[in-house]
Amino acid sequence: EYQEQYSKIPYTGLQLLDLETTMMLKPDLLVGWHSTFMPKVLRSTDFWHKRGVNTFIARSSMIDAKPRTLANEYKDILDLGKIFDKNERAQQLVGQMQQEVNFAISHTAGYQKRPRALVLEFMGKEPTVYGEKSLAGNIVKELHGELLAEKQRAIGLEQVVELDPDVIFLVVTEFNYGHEQDVLDRVNKHKALKNLRCVKEGRVVALPLYAIYSSGVRTYDGIK
């Protein structure tokens, strides 16, 4: 849908540009995460304001921005719509997301049992849990799913087996984009997990980080 406009953007890589290159581009506005404006990255917002460059930090990227919610993503989109004088388009994007949420709710209203979901990322010795304060967790709850291990930060494989989730979402970070199957195989082919019902039924799903962390317009992909 946006291929033509996207092709006109000077830089679209996953790696953040360095300070010198960013300044050479002479931006009017920098839109980023809280981490974008750290001293060792692109300097502080004050640094840019003194040079006449405006800044916008995504709400959910703030260190204390918990819980991270769909409502915050909607607000960011609407605020950017005001900045770029694209209010109607911003409202349309938010409306599409809300429509998807309402669609899921209406089609699961008759379920006697809510789908039980576990959202994990493999890092360190134990999988990290995306719990009740994460955007991914909020999406699961907004869609009337039951979020498992919602108060935990990590989880052992034995507990995963005990929970027997209806679906496991595996978060794929930028380092593994294009290698989603390798991430899925960490569950599907793991000797301790391969007999889970959700594995046998093909309900282990790759979830790109860009769709569930400070995701803005890409939140639609996370909801879908």
Each predicted region: which residue ranges?
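A short, structured surface patch at a secondary-structure boundary
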Residues: E1-L25, L29-F37, L148
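Short, structured coil segments at secondary-structure junctions
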Residues: S7, K50-G52, L143, K200
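Alpha-helical, coiled-coil/dimerization segments enriched in small aliphatic residues
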Residues: K8, V129-G156
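Short, Asp-centered acidic motifs that coordinate Mg2+ and/or phosphate
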Residues: D28-L29, D166-F169
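Extracytoplasmic substrate-binding proteins
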Residues: L29, R43-M123, E150, G202-K224
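Short beta-strand->loop
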Residues: N54, R186-R203
